[in-house]
């Protein structure tokens, strides 16, 4: 993998990780169009450490507050407030993707990274996001969050294992279907992603240097630079998205997904771009 490839792919990762447009899908598309290869699940997972570091810093106060409340609540029942429950909800919601990620690791690295799968998921899931935005009442705030919500959003997060779906797209959509307000759905989804993505990135670190089923590999310095680029752009992206969702809906992203997905389907159908 050249330095130019590293910079472009890391930029794509950082800019799209928190937007409901699928960062892994964009990495697959960009690497196939411009570099005639696949960045691979391992490079994606490791570069995600940069964007997840960004979300940790952005939500640092929330994380410290929730963790403190959770630890205190374990000892003193009187301290079991909303933040204490939120700590448990993050744990509960993380379990589904951890289990499926381990069981379907090989499938994620091979078959589901076919561009036909990626762009089809990009287009089809646009309909899910649009429907969630249309039917979501957005009447429930954080005080009314329950463990059932955590389970549903956690299961929705597993859909992000398929490139083209989008982690934030699936979790925000699930939250909207449950009646959560848009900003809460986004914030809870980001908190839910932190432990799962960090675990995935660390687990995939060795394979990023010596991929078994992927053609593009990176050196240690390249992975470091990719992580730093993804961190800076990811921090900018998460701050922008949360401000955007306060005043705007998800239809903007639906339109973008349909446009990119349809264009890619045409390129694939005409043989301009190879699916694998």
Swiss-Prot record:
It is found in: Cell membrane. Its EC number is 3.6.1.27. One of its GO terms (cellular component) is plasma membrane. InterPro entries: UppP. The keyword Transmembrane helix applies. It catalyses: di-trans,octa-cis-undecaprenyl diphosphate + H2O = di-trans,octa-cis-undecaprenyl phosphate + phosphate + H(+). Keywords: Antibiotic resistance, Cell membrane, Cell shape, Cell wall biogenesis/degradation, Hydrolase, Membrane, Peptidoglycan synthesis, Transmembrane, Transmembrane helix. Its main location: membrane. It comes from the Bacteria. It is a multi-pass membrane protein. The keyword Transmembrane applies. GO terms for molecular function: undecaprenyl-diphosphatase activity. GO terms for biological process: cell wall organization; peptidoglycan biosynthetic process; regulation of cell shape; response to antibiotic. The chain crosses the membrane at residues 84-104, 115-135, 188-208, 222-242, 250-270. Bacitracin is thought to be involved in the inhibition of peptidoglycan synthesis by sequestering undecaprenyl diphosphate, thereby reducing the pool of lipid carrier available. Belongs to the UppP family. HAMAP family: Undec_diphosphatase. Catalyzes the dephosphorylation of undecaprenyl diphosphate (UPP). Confers resistance to bacitracin. This is Undecaprenyl-diphosphatase. It comes from Mycobacterium tuberculosis (strain ATCC 25177 / H37Ra).
């Amino acid at each position: 993998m050249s330095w130019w490839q590293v910079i472009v792919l890391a930029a794509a990762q950082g800019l799209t990780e928190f937007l409901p447009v699928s960062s892994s899908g964009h990495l697959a598309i960009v690497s196939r169009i411009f570099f005639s290869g696949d960045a691979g699940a391992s490079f994606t997972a490791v570069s995600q450490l940069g964007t997840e570091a960004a979300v940790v810093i952005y939500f640092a106060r929330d994380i410290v507050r929730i963790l403190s409340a959770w630890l205190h609540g374990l000892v003193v029942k009187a301290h079991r407030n909303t933040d204490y429950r939120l700590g448990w909800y993050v744990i509960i919601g993380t379990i589904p993707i951890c289990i499926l990620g381990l069981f379907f690791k090989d499938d994620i690295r091979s078959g589901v990274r076919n561009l036909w799968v990626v762009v089809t998921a990009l287009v089809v899931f646009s309909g899910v996001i649009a429907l969630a935005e249309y039917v979501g009442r957005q009447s429930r705030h954080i005080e009314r969050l329950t463990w059932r919500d955590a389970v549903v959003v956690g299961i929705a997060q597993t859909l992000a294992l398929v490139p083209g779906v989008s982690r934030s797209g699936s979790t925000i959509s699930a939250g909207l279907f449950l009646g959560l307000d848009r900003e809460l759905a986004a914030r809870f989804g980001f908190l839910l992603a932190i432990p799962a993505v960090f675990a995935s990135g660390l687990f995939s670190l060795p394979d990023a240097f010596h991929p078994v089923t992927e053609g593009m590999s990176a050196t240690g310095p390249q992975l470091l630079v990719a992580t730093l680029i993804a961190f800076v752009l990811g921090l900018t992206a998460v701050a922008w998205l949360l401000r955007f969702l306060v005043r705007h809906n998800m239809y903007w992203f639906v339109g973008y997904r349909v446009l990119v997905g349809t264009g890619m389907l045409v390129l694939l159908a005409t043989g301009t771009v190879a699916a694998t």
